[in-house]
Amino acid sequence: MSFRRIKPFVDDDGSGHCGQENVMNDSVGSRGGNKAEISGSNDDGTTWGGNEPEDGDDDMDMEGEESDEEERPNAQVAISHISFGTLAKAQKSIVRERQRSQSLSKRDWVTDTKAQLAALKESQGIKPLKLQKTREELKRSSKHAPQEISSKRAVTRRREAVAPIIPAAQAARDPRFDTAVKGVYDEKVFRKNYSFLDDYREDEMKALKQEIFKSKDEQKREQLKKELLSMESRRKTEKNKEQGEKVVREHRKRERELIKQGKKPFYLKKAEQKKLLLAEKYSKLNEKQLEKVLEKKRKRNSQKERKSMPLSRRVG
């Protein structure tokens, strides 16, 4: 029993159909052929009851090769009748799918990278950035509690030649620098209120000295020495400032008494204030300490003079 493939035929209008008559003829012919083959006989008079398998396989292979060769030109004819609009739509859909797959792969890579960075930060102990508080988080706990408002404001992209006049009700107020809340800053009052911090600084300096003495790491010791030197210089500057203010206060007190006696007021200049400050400073020193201070000052002045001299006049 032989089989044959049904091939579509393409007409001029592009519509394909199958030949039913040919199929029927082929089927009838195949049946008749089978009967002839079954009742066939050889030349020598001997009869046989079936086809030989080898001849049947060869016929099938030959028919398959012929049908493939016939289908190729038919497929090309069918493709030639496809409109350009259909081809363009197919091409767009292919490009869209390719872009979508690329964007998905890129998005997956970004999420994986972010997850790796977050895990690395957690392993190193780095705290994540604080996110901006939402409106629900900024709500007050009670109506008597102060309202919390974000200080972050977007910077305008437009250049403002003249600053706009903002009403007092809409102007932002920082309570740290608001005179209505804190009042006017007075350095004397501030120093008096926070004078207890000087005792804390003295304790810190003592602890630093002990740590420098016990430390065996040279790099750490140098860092602690720099910190201690900075604290000592700051304390010395504050003491000199307080001493200068004390000299000015005493001078003003004497001048007030002289004004009451009918004399004209005398106002100290900066140079006179420095002289009075040095005189009071040297009066508290003994002879040896005074000689050391004067010797240091002499050396300092000589070095300044040498720096101001031309190179040709500098000697040894």
UniProtKB/Swiss-Prot annotation:
Q: What is the lineage of its organism?
A: Eukaryota, Fungi, Dikarya, Ascomycota, Pezizomycotina
Q: Biased composition, Acidic residues: where in the chain?
A: 52-71
Q: Pfam families of this UniProt entry?
A: RRP36 (PF06102)
- The regions listed as transmembrane in this protein's record are none
Its subunit composition reads:
Associates with 90S and pre-40S pre-ribosomal particles.
Record's subcellular location: Nucleus, Nucleolus
Per UniProt, the keywords (alphabetical) are: Coiled coil, Nucleus, Ribonucleoprotein, Ribosome biogenesis, rRNA processing
| Organism, scientific name | Tuber melanosporum (strain Mel28) (Perigord black truffle)
Q: Which residues form a coiled coil?
A: 202-309
The protein's superkingdom reads Eukaryota
- Its gene name is RRP36
**Family assignment from sequence similarity:** Belongs to the RRP36 family.
Question: By what name is this protein known?
Answer: rRNA biogenesis protein RRP36
Main site of residence? Answer: nucleus
Please name the GO terms of the biological process aspect recorded for this protein, alphabetically: maturation of SSU-rRNA from tricistronic rRNA transcript (SSU-rRNA, 5.8S rRNA, LSU-rRNA)
Q: Which GO terms describe its cellular component?
A: 90S preribosome; nucleolus
- Protein's job: Component of the 90S pre-ribosome involved in the maturation of rRNAs. Required for early cleavages of the pre-RNAs in the 40S ribosomal subunit maturation pathway.
The region called Disordered is annotated at 1-110, 131-158, 228-261, 293-316
Where is this chain compositionally biased, Basic and acidic residues type?
A: 94-110, 228-248
